[in-house]
A protein has these predicted regions:
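A generic secondary-structure signal
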Residues: 6-10, 83, 131, 192-196
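Secondary-structure boundary elements
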Residues: 9-15, 147
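Active-site/acyl-donor-binding loops of N-acyltransferases
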Residues: 17-79, 134, 157-183, 187-258
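Long, charge-rich alpha-helical interaction segments
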Residues: 55, 77-86, 111-115, 119
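Conserved N-terminal entry element of GNAT/NAT acetyltransferase domains
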Residues: 73-104
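Glycine-rich acyl-CoA binding loop
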Residues: 1-11, 182-190
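A conserved beta-strand-loop-helix scaffold within acyl/acetyltransferase catalytic domains
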Residues: 19, 23-25, 30, 41, ...
């Protein structure tokens, strides 16, 4: 009842888009009682293994720390990634610079590019500062500098695997860049992720993104599990979104996952 009341108050203003990513148990409540509509394309989860140690451990019961470290040292996928990182150089036309300041250049880029890509949330400096830099989690925000011009950003987060002690995942949380350079940017961002994985002893790179995103990252990642459904409240703004054509771009940064 409290949720229904809050949604009703926000909806009366008519200028708010209200959306959610319910689980299988709460989805019927959103649709039948809260006046939401299910969007055709939800959010998929994709994983790229950067080590095989976890696979080997499935065949061992209660391995010691020394055994785990030995497996890490001998891990063939880890060593292959290390060789790949040495042989693969970053393109000289592009730089990825970590920043703890999000300001006017992000706003200008957002104003220029948002008409080309449909997003659930804004990606201006106010949202990005609130979502990432003011968050207690240690998000890393990287500026994309292409031919000396600001050309977008991406955000990563390193987390311990909750189901496996001593294992770490690298999440690609958010990204937004010019669609005309999509293939090039995707290729170079993946190089950065692999280098981070190799240097930081990461076991998996994980991405969550909309199933129909125009900026979708598809290179050698394995889909896991079912997609998370997206629902939108059918107020005035929500109906405008529901009547628009796909595809939309949304990422883990648009959810309450963290």
């Amino acid at each position: 009842e409290a949720v229904m009341e809050s949604i009703h108050k926000i909806s009366e203003k008519n200028h708010h888009l209200i959306y959610g990513f319910p689980n299988q148990y709460s989805l019927p409540v959103y649709i039948k009682r809260l006046n939401f509509e299910l969007v055709k394309h939800g959010m998929k989860t994709q994983i790229k293994r950067t080590r095989l140690t976890g696979v080997f451990l499935n065949f061992l019961s209660n391995p010691s720390i020394k055994t785990i470290e030995l497996l890490r040292t001998l891990d063939p996928l880890k060593n292959l990634l290390k060789i790949e990182s040495i042989l693969t150089r970053q393109n000289k036309q592009i730089q990825f610079i970590r920043t703890k300041k999000i300001g006017d250049e992000f706003d200008e880029f957002w104003r220029n590019e948002r008409k080309n890509i449909k997003l659930l949330n804004v990606r201006d400096s106010k949202f990005l500062n609130w979502r990432y830099l003011l968050n207690k989690k240690d998000f890393e925000v990287y500026k994309i500098i292409h031919k000396k011009e600001f050309s977008g950003f991406f955000v990563i987060l390193e987390l311990n695997d909750p189901s496996r002690p001593n294992f770490k995942n690298l999440w690609l949380v958010d990204w937004f860049y010019s669609q005309k350079n999509k293939v090039f940017f995707e290729k170079e961002i993946l190089k950065v992720l692999k280098n981070h994985a190799q240097k930081r002893n990461i076991d998996n790179i994980i991405i969550q993104q909309s199933e129909s995103s125009p900026l979708g990252i598809k290179s050698n990642f394995k889909n896991v599990g079912k997609s998370r459904p997206l629902v939108i409240h059918k107020n005035e703004i929500g109906n405008k979104y529901l009547n628009q054509l796909y595809p939309w771009h949304f990422t883990l940064g648009d959810t309450d996952h963290f």
